[in-house]
């Protein structure tokens, strides 16, 4: 109830037309069925079409966004073994009643530049002793860890970033930058 009141406040006061709501114990069904939010885009880390019950929506306002697409694209991009099938499935995923949001970089992991610049995370300077963030970044430094001035490395990194964005744009679902 508190979450829906907060979302309604932001919608009415500031004209916000969509929300990304991630975390445990989110009342997905309650928010998805809320009459005042049916024209508002709601993005969750998990939702299934059961939230609609018997009534299938005219406007698909509920979407999911998780890192599955990101992991598949990054693994395929760096040529991990046996990734073509997983990449193709992730690219074609488009559930009938719930929108799928795809991304190759987000707020809780490597940026796209970091994905092509580092094999390992380097968070030593932030006071967390490099314990924060995921160890599974599916990244490849293109031949040199961190910033580089070598033209060949920079060129390969640019190509890899363009490849990642092309895979994002050509996949089914909604691309998120």
Predicted region positions:
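Conserved alpha/beta catalytic core and glycan-binding cleft of carbohydrate-active enzymes
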Residues: 15, 28-177
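Hydrophobic residues within beta-strands of alpha/beta enzymes
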Residues: 17-19
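Generic beta-strand/beta-sheet core signal
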Residues: 21-24, 45
């Amino acid at each position: 109830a508190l979450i829906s009141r907060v979302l309604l406040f932001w919608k009415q006061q500031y004209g916000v037309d969509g929300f990304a709501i991630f975390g445990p114990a989110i009342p997905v069904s309650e928010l998805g069925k809320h009459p005042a939010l049916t024209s508002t885009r709601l993005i969750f880390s998990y939702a299934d079409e059961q939230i609609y019950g018997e009534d299938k929506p005219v406007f698909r306002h509920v979407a999911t966004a998780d890192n599955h697409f990101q992991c598949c694209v990054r693994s395929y991009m760096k040529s991990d073994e046996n990734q073509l099938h997983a990449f193709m499935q992730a690219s074609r995923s488009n559930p009938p009643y719930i929108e799928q949001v795809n991304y190759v970089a987000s707020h809780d992991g490597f940026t796209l530049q970091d994905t092509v610049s580092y094999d390992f995370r380097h968070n030593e300077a932030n006071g967390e002793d490099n314990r924060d963030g995921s160890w599974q970044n599916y990244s490849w430094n293109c031949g040199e860890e961190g910033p580089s001035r070598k033209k060949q490395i920079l060129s390969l990194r640019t190509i890899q970033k363009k490849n990642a964005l092309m895979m994002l744009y050509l996949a089914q679902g909604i691309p998120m930058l």
